[in-house]
Structures are given as structure tokens and as C-alpha cells.
Amino acid sequence: MKTSPHRNTSAIVDLKAIRNNIEKFKKHINPNAEIWPAVKADAYGHGSIEVSKAVSDLVGGFCVSNLDEAIELRNHLVTKPILVLSGIVPEDVDIAAALNISLTAPSLEWLKLVVQEEAELSDLKIHIGVDSGMGRIGIRDVEEANQMIELADKYAINFEGIFTHFATADMADETKFKNQQARFNKIMAGLSRQPKFIHSTNTAAALWHKEQVQAIERLGISMYGLNPSGKTLELPFEIEPALSLVSELTHIKKIAAGETVGYGATYETSEETWIGTVPIGYADGWTRQMQGFKVLVDGKFCEIVGRVCMDQMMIKLDKSYPLGTKVTLIGRDKANEITTTDVADWRGTINYEVLCLLSDRIKRIYK
């Protein structure tokens, strides 16, 4: 989807806020650990290239989801180490090796396919993934891990790291977290040899389980200023949201009592009402569930009325406003604020999803 630069709907990204959030984490975590920010999914909607360049001097490397995301960073002259967190097809490992991109090795079966595909593997770096209870990818016992290490050594593959991912580090009940931690530690204790990087700390673990000593801290959602638990757990220090979402009024009208607004005629006015149209819709990631939610106009809350359309939505105004008046969907306007977590709670989802659904059609403005 193409960005729409001629439409005044924008995600404003504060790169200084992201840098400040990283600096606060550096004071909170093990001082010997490297921070490797997660810039996957276009840096959670903030812009992976711009974010990576803005924070490169503060971090040891970057984490992405797939090989294409890593290649994009390399193509834009991001030179720090990059780790692909998901498995890739074995026939593409030569691309990763040539670009100095580290790969997740999710299983012995995958590694066997890699050595069958490629004759020269000395430039390949792998991090063995451990499934300690997430149930996604990774090995589940030390025997498989040691077989992978042996196979890597045989073909001169660089066994650079090993890691796991916690499923419940952002929850008050620590039972599952401690079970995963114990499983991972047991596998680490049984390895035939230790790699350069052992890492299990995601954002939530870095915030609420900082007793872990890790070589890498994989920093995600809180780098962008959001609480990974939503509102469940209190943050140990303040962070600043880096993204605000704004648009404008493109049409304003007064309609009579008894008129309807939007597809399905789901909203009917009970009195004469000022209605404003805003150029954002579900094609931009502002989903249909947002009907009934509020936005800010001149610092005042205004209800979204009628169904959110593909490209536009309508809001109930307290009075007439000039065309071009700013509408804040996420962010602060005067004394009031709408957070990404507020939007997530309304939708019954998580703040991560709200950010990641903001489509490329919304232009990003960096400050």
C-alpha cells in the first residue's frame, strides 16, 4: 500500500523519546548486557529504518522477524549486527551469510537441510531457538541442542547464540515464567559448550525480572513508550510514548434530529448535531470496532459515530469548526490524552496490535 503524502493523516514519531526510553532501560538492566531493539514489523509501526538509524549508537544490534526485514536494514546502510528471530527457508541462508545477518536455528531438522543446501557455511551465524514453554519455535531438550552444536562445528557454522522467549513475563502470576526459566537454565547447564550470546530477556522480563543476567536484552514495545502488560503491572520507571496519530476535519455539517450517519444507518441523531468527517478508516488500520470511541478536537472528546468506513469516519462535534482543524486519535491535546492502550482496551486487544495495524498509507513524520 502506498503512503498518502497529500492526505493530512499522520503518525508523528518522536525519535528523541525512543532514545530516551532506551537510555532509561540501560540504567535499569545489567550494565554488561547489550540492548538489541526489536525493529520488526516496521519497528511496531514507527518505521524500522528511521528508528534503527536514530538509535544505532545506543545498541549492540537489532532483532527482526524475517530475512526481508534484515535485508531492508542492510540496504539502508544499517551496519550493526542483526538477528532474524523467525526461521527462514534453508535455501536462503547464503543471503544471510553474505550480509552478516544472524539466523535463528529452530530445530536439528532445519539445520540438516541447511548443510544439505550449502557447501560453504563458514560465514553463517546461528542462534539456537529454545522452546521453553512458548510453544512456537525452537528445540525442547538439551540432546537436540548438542546435536545441533556438533553439526554446526562440523560445517564451520558459527554457533553465536542461544535464546528463548517468555510467554508470561508481563503477568502478575510468575508460575509459568519461573517454569520456563528453569527449563531454559537446565538446557544451558547441559550444553556441550557455551556460545557468545545467551539471551532470554524480552521487554517484560527486562522490566520486572531484571535479576536475570543476560548477554543481550531484546527490547521491544517499551522502547516505543508503552507498557507490555497494558495496565496490569506498574512500570518501574516512566517511559514516553513515541507515536501520536493525528488527522483533520475535511467536512463539517449540521444535520437534523432523526437523520442517520454511516453504513447500515447504525447511528441516528436525537437532536440537531454537528458532524465532522475525518480522513482515516479501516484501510489505515483504524478498525470498525472504533465506532463509539472518542477522539480529541480542540482538547475535547468527540464520539466516533456510525460505522468506520474504509477511508473515512464521522465524529460528533460540540460546535462548528474550521476545515483543517486537527483531530487527535492517539496522543495529547491540551489537558486530555488518548493512549494506544486506551484504543487497545476499547478493541479488546493489546497495544502492540494497534500500532502494527497502522498501515503504510498513513505518512510518518519524524521529529
From Swiss-Prot:
Q: Which cofactor does it need?
A: pyridoxal 5'-phosphate
> Which top class of enzyme applies to this chain?
isomerase
Residues at the active site: K40, Y263
Native organism taxonomy: Bacteria, Bacillati, Bacillota, Bacilli, Lactobacillales
Entry keyword set: Isomerase, Pyridoxal phosphate
Instruction: Report the family membership.
Output: Belongs to the alanine racemase family.
Name of protein: Alanine racemase
This enzyme catalyses: L-alanine = D-alanine
**SUPFAM superfamilies named among the record's database cross-references:** Alanine racemase C-terminal domain-like, PLP-binding barrel
